[in-house]
């Protein structure tokens, strides 16, 4: 009985450690440089061609391409191949055609993240063949643990599925192969104060949550210890498509509120002649975009079209499941030598130049610097949370 309650309590508290809690420059705390924008309404990448990586940064490990697309391989301790778009977009849609990595403890991740620690996630555990995880964070707030859900999907490690995040100022909708599995409305997220609403970039990566150097709770959440001798374990991404509701050359936070109303954007230009035939962007006229003036200006904000959001509840949708007590337990984190995305796809770093929040422990090092630095401090902090809960229950 004690174990039952301990497991349930840990399952509830573990998401506290899973948001990104570090940013190179957090606009909630100080004035930051503008974000480079996607100055087009759409962007597509066919990862069966190496040129599709032209608008991406390989921030950890190596990401080769092959017939099945970009390859994110975990073969040994510390492997956490990760790529980020080199641009941000502001409301719209992100579609990723992915086959998750197999292997107990191996995590495949699709993450949208912003500089002020807003985040929207997909995560697939290598040993879970029937479901995937959805999650979100606003402003790095990890004080509640009701954000994550598990939703059904068939054989994600054997089959390519299209994972979609449709993101507007009113709602976030997660879909698999065109079927909605979860909807989060603006008001569901603490009255909108924790709703993801600032310019995001897309991050893709895999890592070993089951690495033996990780905290016990992380390993349990990931499904168990990763057996590297049975690998390698590869996540494949065939293609990516992004719709940008507000094309712009750059996005600027006009104050420290972190609200979508505070975002100013500069210009929309036609960059349809992109780097290659397999990585292309298209610009169209939009009421959302400002003029091409170099002075940032607020313009009528556009949002992508989507189904009417559900009126209430943290998660809704025909296939969504409750987040109250997931079938696996544990937190997130990468190995102490690697970096990667996960439910803990957040950025963190030992650099003294960044800014951090007190919301929770960082789960990964700052990937934009291309570093695979140590995160012993952050995973230790998560482990302390687990220990504290267990101690209280034992008492």
Curated annotation (Swiss-Prot):
Q: What is its EC number?
A: 3.2.1.14, 2.4.-.-
Q: What does the entry list as the binding residues for chitin? A: 123, 203, 207, 218
Please report any disulfide bonds recorded for this protein chain, giving both cysteine positions. 25-32
With respect to pH, the record says:
Optimum pH is 4.3 to 4.9.
Q: What is the effect of changing residue 109 to A?
A: Leads to a four-fold increase of the transglycosylase activity
**Lipid-attached positions, GPI-like-anchor amidated glycine:** 370
Q: Which residues make up the pro-peptide? A: 371-395
Q: Where is this region: Disordered?
A: 271-374
> Where in the sequence is the active site?
119 (nucleophile), 123 (proton donor)
Report the gene knockout effect. Answer: Does not affect growth rate, germination or sporulation and displays only minor sensitivity to high concentrations of Congo Red, even when all crh family members are deleted.
Q: Name one GO cellular component term.
A: side of membrane
PROSITE patterns tied to this protein? GH16_2 (PS51762)
| Name of the molecule in the record | Crh-like protein 5
Can you name the source organism?
Aspergillus fumigatus (strain ATCC MYA-4609 / CBS 101355 / FGSC A1100 / Af293)
């Amino acid at each position: 009985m004690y174990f039952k309650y301990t497991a349930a309590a840990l399952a509830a508290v573990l998401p506290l450690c899973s948001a990104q809690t570090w940013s190179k420059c957090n606009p909630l705390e100080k004035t930051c440089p503008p974000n480079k924008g996607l100055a087009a309404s759409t962007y597509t990448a066919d990862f069966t061609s190496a040129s599709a990586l032209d608008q991406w940064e390989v921030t950890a490990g190596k990401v080769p391409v092959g017939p099945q697309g970009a390859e994110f391989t975990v073969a040994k301790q510390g492997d956490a191949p990760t790529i980020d778009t080199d641009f941000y977009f502001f409301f719209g849609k992100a579609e990723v055609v992915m086959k998750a990595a197999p292997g107990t403890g191996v995590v495949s991740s699709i993450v949208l993240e912003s500089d002020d620690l807003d985040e929207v996630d997909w995560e697939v555990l290598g040993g879970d063949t029937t479901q995937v995880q959805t999650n979100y964070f606003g402003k790095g707030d990890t004080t509640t643990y009701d954000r994550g859900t598990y939703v059904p999907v068939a054989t994600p490690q054997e089959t390519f599925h299209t994972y979609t995040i449709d993101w507007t100022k009113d709602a976030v909708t997660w879909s698999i192969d065109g079927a909605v599995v979860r909807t989060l409305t603006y008001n569901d997220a603490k009255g909108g104060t924790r709703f993801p609403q600032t310019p995001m970039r897309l991050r893709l990566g895999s890592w070993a949550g089951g690495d033996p150097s990780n905290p016990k709770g992380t390993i349990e959440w990931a499904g168990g210890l990763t057996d590297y001798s049975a690998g390698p374990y590869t996540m494949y991404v065939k293609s990516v498509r992004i719709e940008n509701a507000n094309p712009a050359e750059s996005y600027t936070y006009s104050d420290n509120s972190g609200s979508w109303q505070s975002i100013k954007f500069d210009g929309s230009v036609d960059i349809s002649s992109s780097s290659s035939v397999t990585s292309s962007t298209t610009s169209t006229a939009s009421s959302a975009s400002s003029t091409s003036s170099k002075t940032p200006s607020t313009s009528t904000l556009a949002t992508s079209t989507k189904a009417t959001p559900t009126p209430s509840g943290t998660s809704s949708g025909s296939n969504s499941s409750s987040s109250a007590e997931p079938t696996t337990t544990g937190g997130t984190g990468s190995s102490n030598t690697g970096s990667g995305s996960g439910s803990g796809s957040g950025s963190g770093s030992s650099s003294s130049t960044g800014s951090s929040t007190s919301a929770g422990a960082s789960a990964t090092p700052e990937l934009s610097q291309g570093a695979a630095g140590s995160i012993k401090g952050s995973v230790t902090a998560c482990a302390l949370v687990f220990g504290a809960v267990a101690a209280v229950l034992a008492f």
